[in-house]
Amino acid sequence: MAYSFTERKRIRKSFGTRDSVLEVPYLLQMQKDAYTAFLQADKEPRKRTIEGLQAAFDAAFPIVSHNGFVEMKFIEYNLARPAFDVRECQTRGLTFASAVRAKVQLIIYDRESSTSQSKVVKEVKEQEVYMGEVPLMTDKGSFIINGTERVIVSQLHRSPGVFFEHDKGKTHGSGKLLFSARIIPYRGSWLDFEFDPKDILYFRVDRRRKMPVTILLKAIGLNPESILANFFVNDNFRLMDSGAQMEFVPERLRGEVARFDITDKSGKLIVAKDKRVTARHTRDLEQSGSTHISVPEDFLVGRVVARTIVDADSGEILAKANDELTEALLKKLRSAAVRELQCIYTNELDQGAYISHTLRSDETVDEFAARVAIYRMMRPGEPPTEDAVQALFQRLFYNPDTYDLSRVGRMKFNARIGRDESTGPMVLSNEDILAVVKILVDLRNGNGEVDDIDHLGNRRVRCVGELAENQYRTGLARIEKAVKERLGQAEQEPLMPHDLINSKPISAALKEFFGASQLSQFMDQTNPLAEITHKRRVSALGPGGLTRERAGFEVRDVHVTHYGRVCPIETPEGPNIGLINSLALYARLNEYGFIETPYRRVVGGMVTNDIDYLSAIEEGKYVIAQANAVLDKEGRLTGDLVSAREKGESILCAADRVRYMDVSPAQIVSVAASLVPFLEHDDANRALMGANMSRQAVPVLRPEKPLVGTGIERVAAIDSGTVVTATRGGSVDYVDATRIVVRVNDDETVAGEVGVDIYNLIKYQRSNQNTNIHQRPIVKKGDRLVKGDVIADGASTDLGEIAIGQNMLIAFMPWNGYNFEDSILISERVVSEDRYTSIHIEELVVMARDTKLGAEEITRDIPNLSEQQLNRLDESGIIYVGAEVQPGDTLVGKVTPKGETTLTPEEKLLRAIFGEKASDVKDTSLRVEQGSQGTVIDVQVFTREGIARDKRAQQIIDDELKRFRLDLNDQLRIVEADAFERIEKLLLGRVANGGPHKLLKGAKIDKPYLSSVEKFHWFDIRPAQDEVAAQLELIKDALEQTRHSFDLAFEEKKKKLTQGDELPAGVLKMVKVYLAVKRRLQPGDKMAGRHGNKGVVSKIVPVEDMPYMADGTPADIVLNPLGVPSRMNIGQVLEVHLGWASKGIGQRIGDMLQQQAKAAELRKFLDKVYNARGRTEDLAQLCDEELVAMAAHLRHGMPYATPVFDGASEEEIKDMLKIAYPDEIAQRKGLTATRTQAFLYDGRTGERFERPTTIGYMHYLKLHHLVDDKMHARSTGPYSLVTQQPLGGKAQFGGQRFGEMEVWALEAYGAAYVLQEMLTVKSDDVAGRTKVYESIVKGEHAIEAGMPESFNVLVKEIRSLGLDIELERS
């Protein structure tokens, strides 16, 4: 395999034993595909499929007026180009969206000429109508809503279809299983069927009052006879003068206890009374040729009549279907000469009489009565007219406008009720309802299985596209109502479509969804991993999903079908555990929204490289081997028994039974979990914490690649969009800190396209979490690039790999109690080298509004401020970029008009004379908050249309235009150079007809001539050949065209920048100031490894006091060894060992470079490291120069990849340690024989510690829980309104709560005065607080405690209950 630009600089040595059959797919595929399918922007309108926006429009149109003579038809929709790009939207606080314009026709039919069969068109009006704005997805899979980046999380919800379940015996005291079924449509009423403890079957619509199911069956057109015929088989009886003859059916007799003597037709006794009928008995009966059995009279009593019996002579109904036979009824039947009788066959075991009993409890008589009963249940209190009753019943399940099963629902429904076809109508049919009731009765009879609702075959994912489509449909439905009412007017008045359609409901629905839905979330941008995980998240919460409170254990638990689809590790701790999951690494969605995972096909024990994606439903049919199954050289499964999975259970089976095999061992985990090396050695709880905390790592100043990784780092970094990748191949033409200019390869440019790519890098941009997004170029001028190469690193990436922490030398040993209970002891060297220093950017906003008393003004002229306090503001009153500010410093000067106070005549006179204006305004400037300081790195000024810009705003616009012009000039420079190169090739050696500088006719054009002529005059040369002249003219036109398009682009940019900004109502001007704050590591900051080993920095120790090795190397971090055994995260120990080997090999390479070893020697050593164990690397691809350059990158540590579940073994780590530390080096460092431990020395005393200490390198992270953000102090501040107690929390500048337990502590000490102080003057004794202040000012330190306000509140509350309470003064 060929190495990419960054891989050539640093190849990661992998211990994976299996070659990748399938590359890790693009990690944001799910989000991007879903939204592309929703918009279908790049498809021609005629070729769009019916999904997304197209489906929403098709469902809403055509709209027909109430009288039917006016109709509005939808033709097609178009998406406009967004007015602002992503960066402009972020800066200006706008939504990155595109306007939807729908082409509609308003058709008016002629009333006079039209008949009921055909309508004659009178007039057609066609017009494009604005249909609201649809937010667009950025390249990174997020949305910009009101200037902030948001993510729409996919929702895992119960799939539409039919589900059968039971209550597990919880409802009834006896523990009896009550079965139920539920038909869930995508849109429309839910239909439930359920048994009660008395075995009567009921149905409910939308969880309303329950009714016997036979009412529904009658309502769909079945009569009692056909209901019984559908659910029961019949026993045929022939009535005799006494008793009867029953038709002999062997299956029905077998196993029953005979209630009478059974004889064959000759009268021979076959089964005696009270004996069980066996198979031998039924065989004897069959052999004797008996077709009927004589049964006594009492055998018939209590049987249920299957069909209505009518007297043939009189027409009188003798017995109705479902009547029970009594002796009287039998007598009546005999007297009416009824000989043949059909009764339903039931038994206790597998043919319960449930429907018969239900029918008996149902009082409705016919179809209409049943529908009236349903109407009364749905609309209690409304009079049931015939039309209303029929209309309601039709609307419930049979009307496509109100009921939609969806394609998924129909597919699942048909599969569950045993139909072969997967398509069908989107509404229910009578057969569907009947089939569901039949299956439910079968379940109650003991046949079949209930469904598992947590099976991923019964839960599907709703993606962004689908969620947005549902919102758009909602908006269109509201429009449809309004248009329908107004369509009638279009006949009388000359209205156009845009007069009828008001797009507000659509905009409102979309705005509400993207801005405020539970599934639209503020993007987690702490680091690239957090970003990518957020977009791959799958939530069971949200509208139409579960709620935290109601979700039980089963829903949250890991299910066997999660394998390869949903990560079993990465989920939040706390109330959302198991409800929010992450998609597994290779998972994708199928057309129905079910999660699929890839498997390699196995044919006759031979593993092929063909890949099939299976959903959870399909997977259950096959035997699937694990990814680490042993294969021989030909790729055949070896061994008698292979470890595999069948229906979710682990089994051992023969190789020829295996049909599929896992693609990769990492297939079961998510991106975050797959970045944890040695994950297989960590306890699941700690692995969960490790995966979750990796997402909270703060990007540090200088990212450093992990020495021990898993090989997914590069994929994750590229797919997250944090790094900049080359969109086309080419050579680097120009690089500086802010932009990279690439001259594109000729074969990758399309004719007429500019052959240059300019990448503007992001510099010091604030993320959603206030961390710093900053890109650094990693290419130099002249570098050759291939499409997809990483050309600039972003936050938390190093040479195109995710790097969320720093590699630290860790020693596992206690140190004076400073690492007790997971505390972390850290060396001062780490702080002084800025290893964990991070930059945080805060955005401070000030608005000048138009108030009732006049407009606020942003100005430098502020009352009562000295020149000293204003010296950092420019003449517009805005701070300059680069100023270092402290708490309380003014950032933007602003004054607000004050209300006019009533003045005495003298004051009025003085003011008239001296014009003292300053007291009219008050100072409302933007200042730096307490506890915050930093450097101003950027200022943005926004001005409303029609208000003059100040100098600062104009300067910002000029700078922006200058930058844009620079880009255009670069593009033009390269395009021109390219064009003149082509012209030179075209003209050299050609004969000319004349040209500038007195070129004679017939002269040959050569290089000296061309270099003597100005390039722009080359176009004046007249070649003799016509085709050459034509080509020259073409190049000239293309250049002119390019220049013109660049000028247009510049003008458009200028227009955008100079037009007024959209600001909130009443705001005239807005200034945003960005402060960059440097945060160094300090005690109280939270840190963690990648294995859930978290802790808080307890002390930063001078480097000379840290434990050190025999060669003088001091440890960076000292961790408590007791944090490992009980937590069972042994992965950290293995990481430390392999990290130690990595550093040792790096040092050996560094030594070789320092001694200027020959390239061949270097190659030999690297070949030994890379190709001794694990996956081999082809170093022959690298020339000597590249090899030495790579070695320079390896000198600080050899990067390893130990893939999840396929990582480095103990032997491999030992081998690497042996290569890294030969005996001589090991001795010098004081290492033990295993090379994993060393004898350390106490930095303070120089004494050697008694026992060897485990030491090595671990990738350690600083988390986004910084003590600076949490610590604050309050002396006086805001108080709660009712209780008058200080507020709580940093945001409210609150105090520390002195709670119940703290009061007990003071009581225990008997500190009465301290306690009184705490409960009164330091809390809510208002008068007392003021008096204490006064006494302190006067220098007297006396306390006069009064009544706490909260006590007064308590008294008032007791009085409000009607209990009088009074205080007695003692």
Swiss-Prot record:
Record field: catalytic activity: RNA(n) + a ribonucleoside 5'-triphosphate = RNA(n+1) + diphosphate
Keywords from the UniProt entry: DNA-directed RNA polymerase, Nucleotidyltransferase, Transcription, Transferase
EC number(s) given by UniProt: 2.7.7.6
Gene Ontology terms describing biological process: DNA-templated transcription
Family recorded in the similarity comment: Belongs to the RNA polymerase beta chain family.
SUBUNIT field: The RNAP catalytic core consists of 2 alpha, 1 beta, 1 beta' and 1 omega subunit. When a sigma factor is associated with the core the holoenzyme is formed, which can initiate transcription.
Protein name as catalogued: DNA-directed RNA polymerase subunit beta
Organism: Verminephrobacter eiseniae (strain EF01-2)
